[in-house]
Design a protein with these regions (language model features):
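N-terminal Rossmann-like NAD(P)+-binding subdomain of aldehyde/semialdehyde dehydrogenases
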Residues: 1-41
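Substrate-binding/gating loop at the entrance of the active-site cleft, primarily
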Residues: 11, 35-93
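Short acidic loop-to-helix transition motifs that present clustered carboxylates
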Residues: 40-41, 63-66, 113-118, 136
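A structured beta-alpha segment of the ubiquitous adenosine-cofactor-binding alpha/beta core
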Residues: 44-45, 109-128
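Generic beta-strand/beta-sheet core signal
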Residues: 58, 76, 81-85, 112-114, ...
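Amphipathic alpha-helical segments in well-structured domains
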Residues: 88, 92-96, 119, 167, ...
Length: 199
């Protein structure tokens, strides 16, 4: 229950703060320019042209909250082509259905529960993409600037020499960094590094 609630809270946070998210992503662009393709803002003539016809996503199974990453695409009028995680196809499917029920065009969504070959096709045919996976899955895309790779957790906790003797003050941070979301997120810490006592 706790993990489900936390993941859904992250998606809720992204949706309810979409105006702030879009402001950050667009640097305050008047979003009406997305519809017209051009306009004037801050005394400057602006034009908008998307860098991709669709955003490709190869989603993981470890956390429903990562679906919050593609939500701004819809507001930015960029279709999404999603390969859901094998064990967790439900969150992206439900989000897509909710967007369609709210009036978003069904054509803005592609939902393809497919294998690795299908995932590769999505990543290689969309102009921009995100891929989640282990090193064997993501390594082939590491040098492709059009594909944002989210691989296995390499996050570490570093306790400097100035703080190590007070390590008990940081137990809560260490615990949550390692175990939040059941320790399954790619941002979970996989080690605690203590240089003062390194061999």
């Amino acid at each position: 229950h706790v993990m489900v609630r936390r993941n859904m809270e992250k998606i809720h946070l992204a949706l309810t703060n979409m105006k702030t998210v879009l402001n950050g992503l667009s640097r305050g662009l008047d979003l009406a320019i997305l519809d017209s393709g051009s306009g004037e803002q801050f005394g400057t003539r602006l034009s908008y042209f998307p860098t991709t016809p669709a955003l490709g996503l190869v989603m993981p199974s470890n956390s429903p909250a990562v679906n919050s990453l593609w939500l701004p695409s819809i507001a930015l009028k960029t279709p999404v082509i999603i390969k859901p995680g094998k064990e967790e196809p439900w969150t992206p499917y439900r989000l897509i259905q909710a967007f369609i029920a709210a009036g978003a065009p069904a054509e803005a969504f592609g939902f393809y529960p497919t294998d690795h070959e299908g995932a590769g096709a999505i990543l290689n045919t969309c102009g921009r993409a995100l891929v989640f996976g282990d090193k064997s899955t993501t390594a082939q895309y590491a040098n492709n600037p059009a594909i944002q790779v989210h691989g296995p957790g390499w996050s570490k906790i570093l306790i400097g020499e100035d703080c190590i003797e007070h390590w008990r003050d940081y137990v809560d941070v260490m615990l949550s960094s390692i175990s939040d979301n059941g320790g399954r997120s790619c941002i979970n810490a996989s080690a605690i590094v203590v240089p003062k006592y390194a061999a």
